Design a protein with these regions (language model features):
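Structured, non-membrane catalytic/scaffold regions adjacent to prosthetic-group chemistry
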Residues: 2-234
Length: 234
């Protein structure tokens, strides 16, 4: 196990201790999936094992790319009919979408009611036209594991990636997405743990076979379902 994974596990354990009282109270009374009123998907708003934060904690690999909108591009390829490289201008010319959704981090915190603006992932898929045998997506960020050329990657089933609330966002709460949170563009996956949404997104590949990403190769769950407490590979 590398140092990065050990640090992340220690962080999670600290969060559990800091919020032990509220978690213990909830655990005695909440349904197995979580607590709170049903969200728009019919599940408890707060997934099991999570606590609510009002700020937006920053977590990364230790590499925070400084990519201007003039430099930023999104390469989209793999098994598609029309591979493209989008500039910032191209990206903003695509149909824009707004959504309000919750953000669930595997490190046990959730932030509710985030107002996003960006491009739905399904719009990207429609643009490039995946081949019939495509079942998976691999997203790659501009960031790398420090001291290496290993980029951040994460995998998502195509069926999940093209859901209505999966976006490539450039705006949060009415302001440009902050650099520390993945700006100028990051992916968000509201029904999965947030590591499934690559920050500083740079490339998307459409694949026939699943390919595990950075954290998935290091012991994190491949499916990442917050309401199943699905944090680590079994």
């Amino acid at each position: 196990m590398d140092d990065l994974v050990e640090r992340r596990i220690r962080y999670i354990e600290r969060q559990k201790l800091l919020h032990k009282e509220s978690v213990d109270v909830d655990a005695a009374s909440q349904p197995a999936m979580g607590s709170g009123q049903p969200n728009r998907h019919g599940k408890p708003q707060l997934p099991v094992g999570q606590h609510v934060v009002r700020n937006w904690p920053v977590l990364d690999l230790g590499d925070v790319p400084d990519i201007s909108t003039d430099e930023w591009t999104l390469e989209v390829g793999g098994l598609v009919e029309n591979p493209v490289t989008l500039t910032w201008k191209d990206f903003l010319a695509l149909p824009q979408a707004e959504d309000v959704s919750d953000f669930h981090c595997v490190t046990t915190w959730s932030r509710f009611d985030n107002h996003w603006k960006g491009v739905r992932f399904r719009t990207i898929a429609e643009l490039v036209v995946p081949q019939p045998d495509v079942r998976h997506v691999l997203a790659t960020g501009y960031d790398h594991m420090p001291g290496t050329r290993i980029p951040y990657t994460t995998n998502v089933p195509l069926a999940r990636a093209i859901e209505e609330d999966v976006l490539l966002v450039h705006t949060w709460q009415g302001e440009p997405l902050p650099r520390e949170h993945g700006g100028p563009v990051r992916m968000i996956t509201p029904k999965l743990y947030a590591w499934k949404g690559a920050k500083w997104i740079h490339r998307v590949d459409f694949l026939a076979q699943d390919q595990k990403g950075f954290w998935e190769l290091r012991g994190y769950s491949n499916t990442a379902e917050p309401w199943a407490n699905d944090r680590y590979a079994s």
